């Protein structure tokens, strides 16, 4: 870092709090004929090093120069030097580690954290007047970690290499920061270090290993403490414990968890910035929220564009974090509202708002991250001139799906103006036994009904609040209104639990999914049945959702494998033996509720409901078929890592000449996956082709063995014989709701989601394979069952939670046994134990380790010389205050491509180039990262000159 220019003194104290790395300021209080400057050598200082505060441009006629610790008049003096007499006088601020030189420079030896602060040089003339005051700020890096010299206080850790392993492969449990005075070490299978679980022990003095009772013959211990496990099997997954003993008989313990890689692929991908459209389909005139998930904490600014391209003409707004200010762009329509979490609200949506939006994020390290969202806008077709007066009663679930134990608001829209009373019912049928509550408008009073559980509250606007939601609350809810002229109106809403948390562990209920969720007139819809019982006698479909002869569509008998159509059958329905039903050429009359009734083998009846939403199709020409737009469907909608997905193309142009598939939303050559020529029925792979993509003659793209980096948008570009282009997009998503289902054993296991947590974030300790006969669940912040470590105790029969001594107020227990920890701190890291008490009073235990990381701080780079000759050598060193970071070197802002002349130290913190060539000239940086963040150093420029 070069010396800064002279600044007015009033800025010195303001800038002090902004100096985050070893840095300095100079500040001249008084005018002087020669500008005195001071600089640090080296610019960045680490604990234990020496630093020289060099003085430049000293005048010859000075009488005395004095160094002070601070910037105030009464700051303690370190010492003063008089050139005429060559006498140095030490002051009260001298610590015994400072030396004053005749050129005015100050040397500080063996710097510590206590040396951080301002240092001031005062020049005094023969009249005992202060001619100038020059100040500099010294910051000292912690010595917790320096290049290739780990701190003696560094904690023992273990890393799984690779993080996940395929069955039959090998994995190295790599040990870091072994104690220097190591006597012996022991490896155990599990979290408790007891003899019966001992895999092997290693004696340092003799460099020998002895197998233990849990040794399978596939484990090898190395002299650095690491454990190699070969021919890995499913039963090898779980925790491993390392215990070390030093020569002073001190013990240290570390744990690591071994996962199968197919599991990690789906459940532990890095958090990407994603945008969610709420609602997914918005009507003209309504409001939509483009909700941003996983916005990075270290962003400088973000930009919204009404396009998939970054152009000023498409810019809606720019938000600058430092100023907390929003700058509006050319595409701003005055209907957009920007939030500092990156989200954008659009009100009074029009058809012109449909299409792609781009969110661009500028991070602290000047890296750019992009995310895209497609907004779907549906035209509202009114049957009258006064659409407001004919607005239908409707209900919205806020949020759309709810975590068990949370609250949900069933928000009512378009209540009649002359409302007299309203009634809420649980289920599809408005009958007295299922009445939750009734509300009288005139008296603003509510009366609970037979189905009221004490958790329901109705508001004056008709909305219903349901608190502490349970599994049996999930179903349809019915609202019936009565106005003053005694007219009735009915609306329904379906309450759904968030299946990413709580619904995995309850008996699987039959559910029906509408594909698509909103269907246009003339299109087809599939009512896809989930969790259909394997053993059943018959099933029947009804429209509307009441069991009567007039409403029956069809009845299927398994024994005879035959179907009997009912009075409501229209000839457009096709049923399948798994209970699902397809309807073709849908009309507006098909909208509404449908009921599936299943007669089980034990003659029990099970019912499921689905609501069909039909959108009017307004063609722009008399021949609407010819204007059908190119579209793509992901089959299935979301995919588990390692499986295959088909991007199914609809409505290809008839005069198609060729088509091109791209990875991303922009059709550019570098992102081209494959092109297909219709005339020759041949395909050519593009630069982005991975060998896993196959294109079919109907334009569809098959992607096999899907990985995390395959997620995102895909673009199809078609070219017809008249050279017209058409473009369609589709988004591929990984299904993370199958984390537990990926486990091949039925053993009780806990999964931390996410695997690595940043300080201040939340982590879910997700429990898999919870037995059905659970009586009580206990959580402990320890591997031992002790009251002082107890977080919570949950009784399933009483549906109540008793908090323990270790409860911090940040934990939440779900009925499926999972534990949510919010606002995580470093103290939350470590091992947790789940203990389950069965109804037969047997105990079952499972453990999980929580890894908590602080965001990394800024690193810096030192170089042996910034100007070197060709054929000489140079060494760059990366310094970071953070332990356990990964290091990557950058050259001219690109990842450094190592040559045979370049050597990295074991931890990659040192880069040596020998010999140096002319092409090595440029800017060098190091990037440090941990599982939750990364930062890059300021660039150091290397100049290369000829001999």
Curated annotation (Swiss-Prot):
Signal peptide bounds: 1-34
Q: Name one GO cellular component term.
A: membrane
Top-level lineage group: Eukaryota
Q: Name one Pfam family in it.
A: V-set
Q: Which residues form the Ig-like C2-type domain?
A: 859-943
According to the record, glycans are attached at: 57, 103, 110, 207, 224, 341, 461, 472, 578, 698, 709, 816, 823
Please describe what this protein does: Cell surface glycoprotein that plays a role in cell adhesion, intracellular signaling and tumor progression. Mediates homophilic and heterophilic cell adhesion with other carcinoembryonic antigen-related cell adhesion molecules, such as CEACAM6. Plays a role as an oncogene by promoting tumor progression; induces resistance to anoikis of colorectal carcinoma cells.
Instruction: Report the protein name in the record.
Output: Cell adhesion molecule CEACAM5
Please report the organism this UniProt entry assigns to the protein.
Mus musculus (Mouse)
User: Its encoding gene is what?
Assistant: Ceacam5
